[in-house]
Amino acid sequence: MTMNQGTKQPVRVAVTGAAGQIGYSLLFRIAAGDMLGKDQPVILQLLEITPALKALAGVVMELRDCAFPLLADIVTSDDPLVAFKDADYALLVGAMPRKAGMERGDLLGANGGIFKPQGEALNKVASRDVKVLVVGNPANTNALIAQQNAPDLDPKQFTAMVRLDHNRAISQLAEKTGQPVSAIKNITIWGNHSSTQYPDLSQATVNGQPALDLVDREWYEKEYIPTVAKRGAAIIEARGASSAASAASAAIDHMRDWALGTPEGEWVSMAVPSDGSYGIPEGLIYGFPVRCRNGQYEIVQGLEISDFSRQKMDATAKELEEEREEVRRLGLVK
């Protein structure tokens, strides 16, 4: 690719599980500039397991066939030390899916075998400022495993995705109130990307009006919260496969906001290491309301927490603490 004078230097974006369903929806949008901006060239560094390298070669052929002006180069490998070399951004999508009859402990153990070596590889070879987003489930605890195995990187650089839940929460509220999604601001997803997550409308607005003035409490507690939390299962039921394009879109949103900033006066939901804000145990990778500026995120402070919210926030924190205990027991984190 010829670089015009004055264009930015390419940044390196590593994606794992790159030949999978989410990867297939994600890579073309990153290469088109949807994630880092229409003026930012990218080098894609794609990691797959050895048996999937042939399929990945096909995806690379398609990426090349799009002739994206921003796609400076593509690297493929089954070795994380190659795929993560000097990476500025890393989207950890590849994970072990839950199989029938699998207990949570089995799933955490299987994913530990993926995320521990990936954390170690990021620690060794990635850019010291790498921004890491874990998409592969159980995302919060997988992010914790990777983070704890990368002791030389700032723990704040490891995040997990609750943006899909956040976007689902916006869309469900828009539908209920008959308003466009653009009218909705400041929803929060607290906690784990699991059925214990808490989609919180207490601060949300629709065209500037408090959301909870526009919907009844019964609908909010009994329908809205479970619908958002169980949407993934509903999609599997309907499509026969898990949400891929919407997950990829949420990953792009998460990284774009982190890299380029959130709109003034608005926040989004990201699962980030808790600093003890809102009484959430320190170190858990937990969904919080965040604002982003200059490539950094900060947890929004000073929000009023009702008794209802407190109970929901503590329940999802408890689940994350149990997951952390389990991976400690397995020797995956300290």
From Swiss-Prot:
Molecular function GO terms recorded: L-malate dehydrogenase (NAD+) activity
Highest taxon of source: Bacteria
Gene3D superfamilies, per database record: Lactate dehydrogenase/glycoside hydrolase, family 4, C-terminal, NAD(P)-binding Rossmann-like Domain
GO biological process, one term: malate metabolic process
Binding-site residues, NAD(+): G17, A18, A19, G20, Q21, I22, G23, N111, Q118, V135, G136, N137
Alphabetical keyword list: NAD, Oxidoreductase, Tricarboxylic acid cycle
Signal peptide: none
InterPro entries per record: L-lactate/malate_DH, Lactate/malate_DH_C, Lactate/malate_DH_N, Lactate_DH/Glyco_Ohase_4_C, Malate_DH_type2, NAD(P)-bd_dom_sf
Pfam families in the cross-refs: Ldh_1_C, Ldh_1_N
PANTHER family according to UniProt: MALATE DEHYDROGENASE (PTHR23382)
Protein purpose: Catalyzes the reversible oxidation of malate to oxaloacetate.
Name of this chain's protein: Malate dehydrogenase
Gene field: mdh
